[in-house]
Amino acid sequence: MIEFGDFYRLIAKGPLSPWLDTLPAQLSAWQRESLHGKFKTWFNAVEHLPQLTPTTLDLHSGVRAEMSPPISAGQREGMENMLRALMPWRKGPFSLYGLDIDTEWRSDWKWQRVLPHISPLAGRTILDVGCGSGYHLWRMIGEGAHLAVGIDPMQLFLCQFEAIRKLLGGDQRAHVLPLGIEQLPELAAFDTVFSMGVLYHRRSPLDHLYQLKNQLVTDGELVLETLVVEGDSQQVLVPGDRYAQMRNVYFIPSAPALKAWLEKCGFVDVRIADMAVTTTEEQRRTDWMTSESLAEFLDPHDHSKTVEGYPAPLRAVLIARKP
């Protein structure tokens, strides 16, 4: 079973220590009552991975680990088999001892769009909401973050993160917890909070923005990345049953509308830092994620539209400060 004791010890003497009033009981209840039916299979794959300590670790330009002398072909094959037991891999890519995990998303491209616009992460304590496999947590550590904490209720992603951590030498600077943002107390302890690819899945987007704000220290920075539509500050798309084949999409505002929402929630210095159309090069089917992807979600005759006839995915990055 995944143990969280190292994380508890890590936060016990710092600004996150009030979290210990609720977190251990939450995670104990999760382990007793909420495990996914496949969790034991996934965790078994993690347990059978070797504990490797790279001689070369690059978290600055990617997530890449090498060892000298290199691991054997047999070791690499065994490692690949265990990692494939954790498919589908959606967020990455990872390059581990000669094995490349080509994930559905080129999350490194998103990072390249975000990084130039945010405050330096060196020395910061960071929360990443909806962190997936934890790819961006490692990139945050690569930028010098003191501690990067990810939360995501999807248990496969937790196992993927623990697998990568094990192959990176058990690095304790990044941690993933199987929680949603609504399960966190108002910690007001993070220097930077990231919410990327989450807002459009929330039934109450303004509540989500308040939840993010409540995790930030005074003068802390929010990095918000989400789907948007073209339009003025009054423009919001409320899709019907599905958007790009996703059922749980509720509100897709324009970037100016999202800026207004952030200001309404009390954020200041709000700016639209980047906008980019999602391409089938950035999100696609791979050998590590073999089901349908963006190409199947777009109108085959007009890639400016989804199969439902809505505008194709356009993503914006907004930066804001908690006063």
From Swiss-Prot:
A single GO BP: tRNA wobble uridine modification
A single MF term (Gene Ontology): transferase activity, transferring alkyl or aryl (other than methyl) groups
CDD domains documented for this protein: AdoMet_MTases
Enzyme class: transferase
Domain of life: Bacteria
Keyword terms: Transferase, tRNA processing
Residues that bind carboxy-S-adenosyl-L-methionine: 91, 105, 110, 130, 181-182, 196, 200, 315
EC number: 2.5.1.-
Known catalytic reactions: carboxy-S-adenosyl-L-methionine + 5-hydroxyuridine(34) in tRNA = 5-carboxymethoxyuridine(34) in tRNA + S-adenosyl-L-homocysteine + H(+)
Subunit structure: Homotetramer.
Role, per record: Catalyzes carboxymethyl transfer from carboxy-S-adenosyl-L-methionine (Cx-SAM) to 5-hydroxyuridine (ho5U) to form 5-carboxymethoxyuridine (cmo5U) at position 34 in tRNAs.
Family membership: Belongs to the class I-like SAM-binding methyltransferase superfamily. CmoB family.
Name used for this protein in its record: tRNA U34 carboxymethyltransferase
Origin species: Yersinia pestis
